[in-house]
Amino acid sequence: MAYYWDMPEATAKAFRNGWLHTGDIGVMDEDGFFYIVDRKNDMLISGGYNVYPREVEDVLKEFPGVAEVAVVGLPDEKWGDRVVAVVAGSGELDSDAIMEFAKGRLSGVKRPKQILVWPELPKSGANKILRRSVRDTLVNEKRTA
C-alpha cells in the first residue's frame, strides 16, 4: 500500500519514515509468531491509565451466559474515559452479578463503571462487533436523556 486514496492527512499520519503504522497491537510468541490482540485506536485512557477494551472484554466473556461484550469509553470530566461494558448472551444476565465477577479479576481502573445488557450487539458484515456503533448509541442516549 502506497497511500490512502484521496486522504493525504491519513496517509501522512500512517506513514512515517517509510513504515506503515497500522494501529494494531500485537504480541510475539516463543516460536516467533505474531498475533494481533487489539487496536491502539481502541485504547481508553481512564484516570491517566491505559485500558485496553479487549482485556476487559476477555474477562467479562468468562461470566456464564455472556456470549458477546463490547467495552467502550464514554467522556468523563474527571477520568477522561469512563469504562462502560455492553454484554449480550443467553438467559437472564444480571449486570450487578457481572460487576461483582469483574471486581475479583480486574483492577479498579479497568473495571467497568457501568454494565448494560442488550439483546444483541451491532456487527459488521464480517460479524465483528462494532464498538464505535455501541459508543455512538450510548453517547446519543445520554444526550437525549
Tell where the protein language model's regions lie, with residue ranges.
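AMP-binding/adenylate-forming catalytic core of the ANL superfamily
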Residues: A2-D6, A10-K13, I25-K110, P119-E120, ...
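FAD-site-proximal beta/loop scaffold in flavoenzymes
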Residues: G18
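Acidic/polar alpha-helix N-cap and adjacent early helical turns
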Residues: D136-A145
